[in-house]
Each structure stands twice: as structure tokens, then as C-alpha cells.
Design a protein with these regions (language model features):
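Conserved acidic donor-binding segment of nucleotide-sugar-dependent glycosyltransferases
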Residues: 338-339, 343-350, 359-365
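A short, well-ordered alpha-helix in the C-terminal region of glycosyltransferases
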Residues: 352, 359, 366-381, 393
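N-terminal subdomain of nucleotide-sugar transferases
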Residues: 1-62, 241, 402
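Acidic donor-binding loop of glycosyltransferase active sites
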Residues: 94-98, 162, 274, 290-307, ...
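Short hydrophobic beta-strand element within catalytic cores of glycosyltransferases
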Residues: 298, 316-319, 323-326, 336, ...
Length: 402
């Protein structure tokens, strides 16, 4: 079986999106399937028609260059037109059995149109809804005209795809609520390869000293600094935490739109000696930073996106044998068993966040139990091998039907 994956972007770019994609491709190859890969014009590397990256071959789509391709709405239409045209070229060359379009809907609509023309079934995989992602990043207004138009396009794609997959139960419920048959929607949950993660590594003394963390209790967040991650709440909780445990440090690894705002907030709260910004770290160096920490914190605020979508980071924390705290948004509830594999606090509540951090830091004798439970959960219930195996039935139904 040959599957043509239609992607927003791919490696060598690094994101949760590309990590999930690569895990899916690796496991599909392990099942004996052939995979072919096309990225949209939004892939930001300089355009080349085809590219090899770490042994993976990618077809690339040229950017739209017409005058109207820089105008709102018309820009998106131009992107979809370019993707559809490139898809038809790749279909003719590769002759896939299935087209598998991954979020956003800008990939799904061209895939559905090209699939209909070529007589090939199309799977649409929803990782998040484009309208919610735009609202959370500040590029769109929730329930505004653009939001409603995008929601209409998403629903159209869900109805016209031959099958729908998604990453979690929250998104599945929303999809079914749009009138899509439950039998049409399959959850392919986010997962990890636990064997690829090491836990309890020895901290690098030189790195500890460089960051000023020697002899300190270290809380950490590793990832992109978006507003919905709630890192401002973590900074606001630090004064209360420091009053009780003055040797606590907060290490923020990464960067993003909120970077400067967070640095300004830390300075305003007189936390420059207690909140450490490492900047972005190469992927192969991230483990060194994880080895420094006692506690991972995921303080996401409650919005539609965080209630519906499950992140990868808490699963990675469990795989690395790290103690974790997370807000009680819906996406976290699907991944974390409160008091068993992690500890949850009331989303948006700075006092409860601080109280929870202090309770966990003062109760280290309970850590081995939680660490073992988390590691067992990801090994038994959230492996990529088990997750990707769910595609067997999805693809099988489509190829039998055709």
C-alpha cells in the first residue's frame, strides 16, 4: 500500500507537528507500507522541487507568486490552488492508493479535490482546528467573520473526506458535534517511543553552574512561548513559591511570541535571579536541560484549543521519568491521571498553581510512585506502535471500498 501524505511543513523544521509526522511515517514503514510526502507552500525552506532530509524524500510545493497571493483570503485560495496543482503532479508520478491530508484545512480541501479527480480515497487528519489555532495565536478573532468562514471550510472538509482521523477524544467529540458520523472518525492519539527517552540522567555540573542552578530546586518548561501556554502565570506564582522555598529556580527553555513579554514580567516582579531564560536549544541538546530539573510545569490557560487538543510534552515528561504539574484543561485531562501520573491545578489560578508546586516539591517521597505510573502509562497505552496500528482499519476500509 502506498500512502501520499500531504503536510503543512516537515523536517528539517522542528515542531510538535513534524515530530508527530515523523513518528507516524516511521511506524507506517514498519508496517510494510510505502509513504510519499508532499509539503504545502507554507513550508518555509527555500523551494526545491524535491528534497532528501535525513533519509526521507519530500516533494515540495512552490510558493504562490501572483499579486493577489499576498492579500487576505485570496492568499489562502492561492495556497490551496498551488497545493492542488502540485498534488495532481505527484499523484501522476507516485500513483498512491490513499491520500492522507494532515491539518490544516488548507491541505484537506486540495487533497479532497485532487482525490476526487484521480479516484483516490482521502483521509483528513485533524490535529487542531485552523480557526482555533488562529484565535489562540492572535491572528484571528474567536467567532468573528473569518473564524466562522474557516469553521465552515473545516466542516466541509470533514464531510467530504472519505475518512477522518484526529489526535484526541476532545477533537473527536467536536467533529461528531458538527454532524459527522461517529463511525467515520478514528482517534490516532499522540504518543511517544518510551525507549528513545532517558530518565534520571546525571546533571551536567558545568551547565548547572552556567545557568546558576547548582544546589537549587529547578522547575522547567521546554517548548514554544505562546500565550496559551500560561507561562505568565508561572512567573506570577514565583513570589509565593520563593517565600516558602527560596532556593527554587524556574528554567524556561525555548522561545516564541511571548518571549519579550515574559522577560519584562520577570523583571517587573524582581525575578531576574530566579527565572532563567536559556533561549532556544538544539534538539540534540534538550536532554541535557531535562537532566537539570526536578519538576516540569505545563500551566496552559483554558481556551477552546487547550480544552480540545492534547499536547505531546506531558507524555514526553512521563517517558523521561519526570514529575509533572499541569493545569486542568481538557487536553491535559486526557493525558494525566491526577495524583497518579501527575498533579493538576485549577487552570488560570495563580494561587492554586503556587500551592500545587509547593505541595509537590515538599512531598518528594511520593515521586517514585508517580514516576513509575507515568512511565508505565506511556509504555503500555501511549506508544507510537500501538497508536499508528489504528490506521490499519482506517486504510483497510477505504481500499476495500475502492
Amino acid at each position: 500500500m502506498r500512502i501520499l501524505h500531504v503536510l503543512d511543513h516537515s523536517i528539517p523544521l522542528q515542531s510538535g507537528y513534524t515530530f508527530r509526522t515523523l513518528a507516524i511515517l516511521e511506524q507506517q514503514r514498519a508496517l510494510g507500507w510505502e509513504t510519499v510526502h508532499l509539503t504545502s507552500p507554507k513550508h518555509t525552506e527555500p523551494f526545491v522541487p524535491q528534497e532528501q532530509v535525513d533519509g526521507w524524500a519530500f516533494w515540495r510545493t512552490p510558493p504562490a507568486t501572483t499579486a493577489f497571493s499576498r492579500l487576505p483570503v485570496l492568499r489562502e485560495w492561492a495556497l490551496m490552488r498551488q497545493t492542488e496543482q502540485r498534488l495532481l503532479e505527484v499523484i501522476a508520478e507516485e500513483e498512491p492508493d490513499i491520500i492522507h491530508a494532515h491539518s490544516p484545512v488548507l491541505n484537506a480541501i486540495p487533497a479532497i479535490r485532487a482525490g476526487k479527480r484521480a479516484g483516490i480515497p482521502v483521509v483528513y487528519e485533524v490535529r487542531a482546528f485552523w480557526e482555533d489555532a488562529a484565535a489562540s495565536h492572535g491572528t484571528g478573532q474567536e467567532f468573528g467573520p473569518r473564524y466562522k468562514a474557516t469553521r465552515y471550510l473545516e466542516t466541509w472538509a470533514l464531510k467530504h473526506a472519505d475518512a477522518v482521523t484526529t489526535i484526541c477524544e476532545g477533537l473527536r467529540s467536536d467533529i461528531v458535534g458538527r454532524g459527522i458520523s461517529p463511525e467515520k472518525v478514528t482517534v490516532i492519539p499522540n504518543a511517544v517511543n518510551a525507549d528513545e527517552f532517558t530518565g534520571g540522567g546525571t546533571p551536567d555540573p558545568a551547565l548547572l553552574q552556567t545557568l546558576g542552578l547548582t544546589g537549587k530546586s529547578v522547575m522547567d518548561f521546554v517548548g514554544s512561548f505562546y500565550g496559551y501556554e500560561g507561562l505568565h502565570l508561572l512567573c506570577q506564582a514565583m513570589p509565593q513559591i520563593l517565600t516558602a522555598l527560596p532556593d527554587t529556580k524556574l528554567l524556561l527553555v525555548g522561545g516564541g511570541p511571548e518571549d519579550e513579554n515574559l522577560k519584562s514580567l520577570a523583571a517587573k516582579l524582581d525575578l531576574n535571579d530566579h527565572v532563567i531564560f536559556s533561549g532556544r536549544v538544539p534538539h540534540d541538546q534538550v536532554q541535557k536541560y531535562y537532566d537539570l530539573i526536578d519538576l516540569l510545569v505545563y500551566p496552559r490557560v483554558r481556551i477552546r484549543l487547550t480544552d480540545l487538543v492534547t499536547p505531546l510534552k506531558p507524555l514526553e515528561a512521563m517517558a523521561m521519568n519526570k514529575v509533572l504539574i499541569a493545569s486542568d484543561v481538557g487536553g491535559h485531562h486526557e493525558l494525566i491521571r491526577d495524583g497518579e501520573t501527575g498533579t493538576m491545578f485549577k487552570a488560570g489560578d495563580v494561587v492554586d498553581l503556587a500551592d500545587t508546586v509547593l505541595r509537590v516539591l515538599k512531598n518528594r517521597e511520593d515521586w517514585p510512585r508517580q514516576l513509575a505510573a507515568g512511565r508505565e502509562f506511556v509504555a503500555n497505552e501511549r506508544s507510537w506502535k500501538n497508536s499508528v496500528a489504528n490506521y490499519v482499519d482506517v486504510y483497510g476500509r477505504l481500499t476495500t471500498r475502492t
